[in-house]
Amino acid sequence: SLVGSEMCIRDRPSVGAEQEYFLVDSAKALQREDIIFAGRTLFGAPAPKGQEMDDHYFGVIRERIGGFMHDVNIELWKLGVTSKTQHNEAAPAQHEVAPIYESANVAVDHNQLVMETLKRVAGKHGLRCMLHEKPFAGVNGSGKHNNWSITTDNGVNLLEPGQTPNENIQFLLVLACIMKAVDTH
């Protein structure tokens, strides 16, 4: 047993990969050879507006983008990817989709399906989906927030802090082991 917990046979890592992406009009993207060949801008003027305002992040999703997101969700569910959350991100034309947590090996495969589905469905909406981590200089890039956890086969979340110092021992031990592993490897 692990620090007084019930016997467990194995631990199960789970992941929820939040995929960020940019959407641009296909007709405009086709006017840029750098976007066509590199999937990002390589030259050009700085963005006309900084990111100091949160009007995009907290703004309403535009109708065209909302239709795209709706179709992406339908296609992902057909593939068995339980996508549920989508929203604007910080930079103009930047968005995010977040599938539901699942076992790590399945989540990685599903993220590949998510990226392919985003690109395919974007084309049907006259959009170009850009997954490059830094497609535009001077604005936020597109990352992949990798939320993860470790759960025993008994359903105990090993990364959940306890309410008392005694209940917190397991969490602190697991956290110390993770930190040591990251430092060593």
Name each model-derived stretch.
Residues 31-32, 38, 73-84:
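Acidic, glycine-rich low-complexity/disordered segments
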Residues 10-15, 83-87, 128-132, 185:
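Flexible, glycine/charged-enriched surface loops at secondary-structure junctions
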